[in-house]
């Protein structure tokens, strides 16, 4: 898939106020400072579509971007940032939960994980929540240019082992990416394109919204 247009639509903290367009949505979420904004800019070919920051926890709202006029990329706040107040964490958790559990247009979530680190408890717990809530998701491992292929394979194997230990029958589909070197971009966009084709083929509600 080629990205021809990418347009910021709206930011808000209430899932009920998200765009009414019945278009497929792909939500991106991960721990703070995982490289989410850089990844979004990389796959959309827009350097400043999502604002990048060295400060973890910068994204604090649900951000909708309309891509090619027929699907939404949704940028969600990061989880697990210790310096955010308990009250703010609670607010984040509530509207993220509301979005995931009530947003009919959500087709797939992408959970971003920094591949430089070994399996993190908070990522395993978040993916367990997604699985228990029956929310379809894939994993995107970021910053693959920062470590060797051997370490990448080792860290992915560690995540697979942890997920099996948490009663997963299999590991969700995953993508290995690097925003600085555009690694994984084509694979990720091809996946979204294939899912979109299935969505439009099997759901007239989505098709009629284009």
From Swiss-Prot:
GO terms for biological process: division septum assembly. It comes from Flavobacterium johnsoniae (strain ATCC 17061 / DSM 2064 / JCM 8514 / BCRC 14874 / CCUG 350202 / NBRC 14942 / NCIMB 11054 / UW101) (Cytophaga johnsonae). It comes from the Bacteria. Necessary for normal cell division and for the maintenance of normal septation. Its cofactor is Mg(2+). This is Probable GTP-binding protein EngB. One of its GO terms (molecular function) is GTP binding. GTP binds at residues 30-37, 57-61, 75-78, 142-145, 177-179. Mg(2+) binds at residues 37, 59. Keywords: Cell cycle, Cell division, GTP-binding, Magnesium, Metal-binding, Nucleotide-binding, Septation. Pfam families: MMR_HSR1. PANTHER family: ENGB-TYPE G DOMAIN-CONTAINING PROTEIN (PTHR11649:SF13), MSS1/TRME-RELATED GTP-BINDING PROTEIN (PTHR11649). Belongs to the TRAFAC class TrmE-Era-EngA-EngB-Septin-like GTPase superfamily. EngB GTPase family. Residues 22-198 form the EngB-type G domain.
